[in-house]
Amino acid sequence: QSCLEGADVMIEASRLEAPEPLFHTEWVRSGALVIPYGTQSTVEDDFTDIMDKIVVDHWEQCLIGPFGCLRRHVDGGKVTRDTIHGEIGSICAGELAGRENDDETILFWHRGLSTSDIALGWAMLEKAKRLEIGTALDYT
């Protein structure tokens, strides 16, 4: 609680076996960026009620499988295509506004796209080259 309550950025990446609220709604301050990323829901049912914007990486991914921090919210109809602000790609492409003021409370639900993995892998490879670290492997 001392790490999360009133924080500017709240990130969770647990691997719980069953849903359990780790993020409590009353801990979220106005203007926070919240990224619950674990396999099970770690937020309370009313958590999405205080969000000014809910952003996802890819809406169709949010509908697949039994896992994800907002699974219960999607299955219950609380989070829908109409209630989310949009997808992160639309924000990055300038087609949709991102944060518009310091008081906006934003939740980003990152389900995990392979393009994210590829981009992160590329960034890691470039950094390793720049620092001249790592071992090159021959894949032929």
Segments (PLM) and residue ranges:
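Rossmann-like adenosine-cofactor binding region
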Residues: 2-78
